[in-house]
Structures are given as C-alpha cells and as structure tokens.
C-alpha cells in the first residue's frame, strides 16, 4: 500500500501541474481512497479493451490505456474537463514520458494486486466457518495421535479419519490460499488489516505449479543407501496419496514420493538421535537463542493454545525474524558442512549427481529469503 501511495502521489503531481497549466483551472482536493476505487473499476475495463496488465506489458499498450482514463472521474479533477491521461502524456518531453509510463504501469499493477487482496479478503470472511471446522478437526486428530501409545492405535486414528484427511488435503492443494485462510482463523489481523494480509499472502501462498515441481524434485532424489521402512504410517500414506487430485492430474508417482519421504524421515530421525555434530549444533543454537529471547516475556503473555501462540508470533514477528536470521547466518557454514557430510555418507543424489548442499542452500536463500 505504501508503494501504491507513492506511485499515486507521483501520478497526481504530474497530472495536476499539466492540467492546471493547460486549462487555467485549479485542481480540487485529493481523495486517494476515492481515486483508488475508480482505478479498481477501471483496471478490468482496461484489460478487456486493450490487454492483460502484466509487468512485461509494452509501453505502447500502456499509452493506449491512457486514452480510456478520463481525469474528470478522479477527485482532484472531478467533472472539470474531458481531458484523458494520454493528453498529459502528450505534453511531456521524452524523459518525462518514459517516467510517466513507468509510473502509470506500476500503479495499475499495484491496483491489480489490491483488487486481488480485496477478493481474497472477501473470501477469507466467507470461508471462516468451514476453516474453523477443519482446524478443530485437525487439532482433534493430532490430539488423538499424541495420545496413542502404540503404532496400531495411531494407525487406527488415521484410518478412522481417512476421508477427512484426503478431502482436506485436496482442498489445501487445490486452493493456493488455504494455508493463509487457516492462519486467518487464529490471527484476526488478516481480516482487519489488508497490509498484513498482503504480507502473509507473500509468505504463505503456494501455487499448484510450485507444489508439483517440488514434489517431483523430492521424488527424484536417490537415497538408496537408506533402507525403506514399510511401517503402518508409510502404508497409510501410500494408500492415501493416489486419491489426491494433485497427484492424479499431474501424473505423479505417489508410491515413489511416499518411499522417498519415508527414507527422509528415517534419515532425519537417525541424525537427530545419533549424529554428534547435529546434537552440538542444536545445543549451541538453543543456548544462543536463550540469550536473545525473553522467556519471562513469553510466560507473561500466557500462551495456552494455538491461537494465542500464533498471535504472539505475529505481534513479535520482526523481533524473532531478526533473531532467526542472525542465528542462521552465523551458523550457515557449519550447517552446510554437516548437511554435506550427511549427503556424502549416504550418497544422496539428484539427477545422478551428488547433492551440493552449498549451491542448493545459497540458491534458495538468494531467491526466497526475502519472503522470510
């Protein structure tokens, strides 16, 4: 919203200066909210008349769109004259024209994002009842699993809730905003503050294409040195995954994916329980974090359920993001070395090549760390 405000101010300043000079009339007071509503109405019309508005849209298409934007619709020039945005563009020199086109394009793109947020905002409210029901059921299943004392008892819990688990996974994987909606149930800021919604949207929105790509990458990992554990949990996952629509529609080998996930789980458990280097890393991290996190503050907050935990994290997000970032960056080389040793020991390959953990982690950090 801040970026849109800056772009809007630039657009208004250039427009007012030129309109007042050309007509001799004085501009009215600016009402940004009023004008944004006009732009939100205009964007779908412009896309229908000219073309889709994308970051790569050509300059001449933007100029064409200017012909369909009349200033008399906006607060600062309401019903004053029939000038269109292109008439101001025509009066500018080449450098100013280039800047004006860029400003107008970026403003339309940001308005487009605002339209999307408004739509999601409406759906979040509409979907709350179903999501509350799903969330309660999920927590109930987790509670029963934690209370299970044997593998057979846990397997029975999963079997009894098989239909719900499959239908919920299908909902989650077919709706890129489903995770966001679940968080909204526990963090009311997503409903009341659109800027918070936009921030969370960037973090927790996952496209189907990204999911499919990630699943294929995991499925193609070669972890043949780790023995497959065909316990009842793995058998349940193997029975369930073929019923997931995302797997069906994208011809993903559910059995192969389940096998790799089982091996990864086995490997992680083994490292956490027997790898001395991993144990030392975790201990050092916890001890370091204790010096930066106020346990007393957490106790005073009175965290006693998922909702209060999510609210606490949300309210202190910036502080904890900084702590996590500092902890990770100070230990990145050590983490990479430990992971590469594990890869080397178990001969973990992708595309017939030994995984290079430094390349993988650094690439991920450079591409996606801005989200966190």
UniProtKB/Swiss-Prot annotation:
Its main location: host cell. The keyword Protease does not apply. It holds the Pfam family Pox_A6. Disulfide bonds: none annotated. Changing residue 233 to A: About 50% decrease in lipid binding and causes severe defects in viral replication. One of its GO terms (cellular component) is virion component. It comes from the Viruses. It is found in: Host cytoplasm; Virion. Keywords: Host cytoplasm, Virion. The N-terminal domain is not required for crescent formation but is required for virion formation. Lipid-bound viral membrane assembly protein that plays an essential role in immature virion (IV) to mature virion (MV) transition. Functions in both crescent-shaped viral membranes formation and its enclosure to form immature virions. In addition, participates in targeting mature virion proteins to sites of virion assembly to ensure their proper localization. Belongs to the orthopoxvirus OPG132 family. This is Virion morphogenesis protein OPG132. The lineage of its organism: Viruses, Varidnaviria, Bamfordvirae, Nucleocytoviricota, Pokkesviricetes.
């Amino acid at each position: 919203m801040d970026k849109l405000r800056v772009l809007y101010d630039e657009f208004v300043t250039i427009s007012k200066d030129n309109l007042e000079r050309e007509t001799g009339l004085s501009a009215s007071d600016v009402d940004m909210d009023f004008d944004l509503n006009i732009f939100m109405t205009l964007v779908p019309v412009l896309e229908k008349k000219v073309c889709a508005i994308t970051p790569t849209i050509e300059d001449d298409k933007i100029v064409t769109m200017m012909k369909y934007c009349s200033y008399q619709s906006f607060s600062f020039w309401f019903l004053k004259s029939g000038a269109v945005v292109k008439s101001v563009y025509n009066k500018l020199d080449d450098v100013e024209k280039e800047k004006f086109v860029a400003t107008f394009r970026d403003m339309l793109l940001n308005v487009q994002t605002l339209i999307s947020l408004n739509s999601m905002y409406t759906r979040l409210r509409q979907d709350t009842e179903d999501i509350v029901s799903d969330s309660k059921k999920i927590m109930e299943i987790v509670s029963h699993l934690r209370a299970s004392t044997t593998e057979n008892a846990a397997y029975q819990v999963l079997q009894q809730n098989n239909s719900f688990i499959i239908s919920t996974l299908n909902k989650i994987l077919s709706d890129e905003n489903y995770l966001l909606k679940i968080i909204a149930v526990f963090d009311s800021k997503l409903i009341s503050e659109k800027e918070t919604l936009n921030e969370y949207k960037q973090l927790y929105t996952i496209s189907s294409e990204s999911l499919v790509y990630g699943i294929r990458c995991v499925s193609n990992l070669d972890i043949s040195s780790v023995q497959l554990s065909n316990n009842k949990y793995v058998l349940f996952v193997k029975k369930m995954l073929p019923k997931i629509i995302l797997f069906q529609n994208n011809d993903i080998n559910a059995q192969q994916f389940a096998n790799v996930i089982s091996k990864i789980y086995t490997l992680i458990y083994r490292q956490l329980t027997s790898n001395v280097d991993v144990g030392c890393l975790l201990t050092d991290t916890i001890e370091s974090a204790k010096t930066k996190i106020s346990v007393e503050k957490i106790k005073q907050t009175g965290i006693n359920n998922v909702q209060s935990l999510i609210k606490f994290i949300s309210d202190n997000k910036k502080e904890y993001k900084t702590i996590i970032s500092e902890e990770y960056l100070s230990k990145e080389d050590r983490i990479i070395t430990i992971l590469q040793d594990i890869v080397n020991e178990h001969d973990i390959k992708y595309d017939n090549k030994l995984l290079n953990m430094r390349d993988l982690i650094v690439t991920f950090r450079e591409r996606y760390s801005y989200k966190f």
